[in-house]
Amino acid sequence: MAKYLESKDSEFNQEVLYRTGENYKGEQTYTPRLVICDLKGSLGTLRHESELYEPTEGSRQAHAWTGKMELFESDPIKKNQYLQSLDTPDGEFKLSYAGDLSKNVKVWSDFNSLYYHPTTVYELTTHTHDDENNRFLLPTRGREVYQELAMDETLMDVRIRQFMEESDNPQGFQIFANSFDGFSGVAAATLEYLAEDYPKKARIVYGIAQPKSTSLSKEQTLVQNINQALTLKCMSEESTLYIPMRAPSVLKYGHGVWQSNLRKHENMYEWSGYLAAAIETATSPFRLTNAFRLDMADLSGLLNPHAFNSTTALAFGLPLSLPQSRDTSLASIFKADEKMNRFESAWDLTLETPYDQIDRTSHCSFSVFRGIASILQHQYPSLNGLQPYSITQVTEELTNFTKRYGPMLAQRLVFLSVVGPTFPQFFGPMVTTTGLIRPTSPKDTDQIGQSEKMLTPEPVTQCASYARLHSGSALKPLFEFAVASLKVSSLNNWVYTDYTHGQFGLDRSDFESSRETLQELCDAYGESVDYDDSFSDDN
């Protein structure tokens, strides 16, 4: 990590997200400016105390106590291939551990390689990971847990305030939270605290939803829809930007150009990796070292200029369809459907469409094109001897794209998306290890001297990506669906009764009030665009 942070070639300032410190041995450390809240039992092999900073509590007691000791310990959690490789740094390190991780990941720490500050990890001790008898399902329960654990003090004052006080002019906060379960309630309470204590700092929230699945029961689907509607209402009011996100659904993988370059996401390890890549690409301008760096507050002002409704959509394409041969023109790569204004090399993670619907009339749009020129340097020359596209040529074509489908503020990044050894290998067989797309016809294959073995999957180590944040009337269907989700009727009243319990319980009037607020936000959008019923329950 230290070697990466000290890189002179990176266009990113890693200290925006990482802090320097010193451990108990006097050695310099790099740890993320991060607080993680998770359930008891979700840490896996991750220790509560980090030996990066101090000896473990058991080690300190062993040195301090001279009397008889009786030791009780549980069986150690077996480490997967990747974590074992970290324990043997001199051993062989594979390009990808995704195959093993995809089968064996149980918690996020199974693919963690970072050291954390002692105040980073915060366990919600009221609930246990994978406890079917005490599930953390409702936002009302999340707010109760926030109060029961006195998180105003134990989380906000002790942990977050410490990171803020040691930071030099922090841009703001990024909050990542499930929008479909109890964590949405914890996030809502946290956001309200931040809005009160740091009103001038940007607060960008990412609401993570599970991919739609036919395996969910009717009750589970109703509960998730209600939770997401309540989260949308709260986050739209308290955040400077709220970005609801859902990974591409297997039910829609048959649509869109992008899907030919990806396999279906099989599990949470894979689909969460896709969402993480989208967020990392879209927010990369926050960390630039040059004059083109974009502050979090500036982005919030661009996408939510009147501070009326912070909800924003995120479209993402990874990998971009950059051909292995130079024979394909750049103009054809970045060509959207002229009639429908759709860029089909991306998936809208908010509107759940297998394309990016571009509104040429809206100024509330920000795009990031990442690593395109770097990836194209690996192209084969054309039959006419043309060499790979230069950075200047790529810049000109991207400028033309933003003019054709603008007004659009865009950022071009040279630094490509590096596919690390723990990142899911959900790429299709036509994607090369350098992130280019192999030709599909036998004629094209023969021209560049390839053979049948080219279809053998190989780890993808880098790729180009595209992300676009946008707001405006395109988001109206999102609010229409939320309004419908909060409509109490005789058919679904049995589900709503679960929300009435506890100190933060909601009755029928509370739901009606939230529904009215969402309806007002919905009406403010005016006429909406037809999005093929993206939000219907049967999709």
Model-derived segments and spans:
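Terminal, contiguous helix-loop blocks that mediate binding/assembly
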Residues: M1-N539
